[in-house]
Amino acid sequence: MAATTWAAGIAAAAVVLPSLYVYTASVIATRFPTLRNKRICLLIAHPDDEAMFFAPTLLALTRPDTGNHVKILCLSTGDQDGLGHVRRTELKKSAMLLGLRDEDDAFVVDDPDFRDSITETWDTDKVATLLSAAFAPQLSRQQAAASAQPPMASIDVLLTFDAGGVSAHPNHISLYHGARRFISALTAGKPGYACPVDLYTLTTVGFARKYCGFLDVFATIFSATLGAGANMAASATSGFGGNNKRDIKNKSDKGNPGLLVTATGLLGGRESAATARQAMTQAHKSQMVWFRWGWITMSRYMYLNELRLEKGS
């Protein structure tokens, strides 16, 4: 009897939970704020980061109706195993599967200052300098000029890892610190001006949430709405807006949302988890060792992303 009850419960969960996820993903796609008509750069450390960690974001932001132009800047060739030339090509193929307009929109840096290493932390100033050269080459002239000259950049939005790096990889974490340094440099000596680039970072979650697949959507939505509620309560009691970065109603100085949540579909189609997996299995074939099969099946980052606007950079 007990075994029958358990079996019935499992069967019901196998139907109800995916259905709830599909509904929740559709709500996220239609009701949560997103970015439109922006020049966006995804900053990653290694070829395959875009597929393993940011696929839901790329699939959402490259939808034709958003009007965004998304590019990828990868700071290493991933040459730790001597496959840098292969992985460079794999990244471009993955980028096209994930919706980028052209292979040339995925650029790979090959520089000894940014070696693929699980033990190496990249220099913050060197990361920031590279970003300045790529997106704000006039930065040194701006700093030398009168403060009345507004800061400028060739991108509107920069996406990268947060301080936890998702997997605590030092190369990932280095991007976070370098990106923040770059954002700060844009407005250094320019009081009163809004930063021309909004920085969003991918939220790192704990082990249990990381490997619960699409089920983490419920914790993610709860976290986002709880943050919004806390912010509204703070506003009501103090008369001022709160500082909770998870507040979905919080906006940047340019009016961009304070939180970006994206989710892939479970069924087929362009914005599905199957497409995210294909970016690994069809593009990054050199990286498909045994444990990555577990990642692309169980990781919540294949199904959903939560990126927060960085304040006070």
Predicted feature descriptions by range:
Residues 2-195:
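Active-site beta-strand->loop->alpha-helix modules in alpha/beta enzyme cores, enriched
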